[in-house]
Amino acid sequence: SAFVWHKRFLQCLEAQEKPKRWLLKDPGHLEHIPEILKTYPDARFIHIHRDPSETIPSICSLTSTVRSGFSNSSDKSLIGSQTLEFWKNVLNKYSSNRDNIDPSKIIDISYEDLIKNPLGEAKKIYSHFNFDLDIQTENSMVSYLAQSKGDHKRKHIYSPEEFGLSKEIIQNELSF
């Protein structure tokens, strides 16, 4: 399994100083819940729910940018249909495997709530998983948030239509 290698890689990274816990963000892991649970039985999951009509065009834009570095042609409509189909399959697989996660090891939060109140959502996560949130960590979060205020705003422009999609098509295909 790729996650055996993944675990070894993390162990190499922590050889000098082991962190309290790893926090990894990869939506691509959604389709690998059984493998993750086998490799990391104590894993916790934070499922951030975000409007797919915003995320799919963003992923399409990233894919288009990456492909343009390796190809003279970049069919944006093809990128749109492939991206939508890929994430539809990922989310279907995730939905069928989600019940394998102990409810105490997963929390669902809204992206909008996270943007509006990041510290409150972080506290909710810590509380749900019974993690200690000491004053030093909380102060570090407050400091980081003060320094990065506004950084979450979209930095480039893209639309579903640019990739042969529409908000309605995305919503219909990814409604769970």
Outline where the language-model segments fall.
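Conserved phosphate-donor/acceptor-positioning beta-strand/loop module used by diverse small-molecule
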Residues: 25-26, 36-61
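Flexible loop/turn segments at secondary-structure boundaries
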Residues: 29-33, 53-56, 115-118
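PAPS-dependent sulfotransferases, especially Golgi type II membrane carbohydrate sulfotransferases
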Residues: 1-17, 22, 59-176
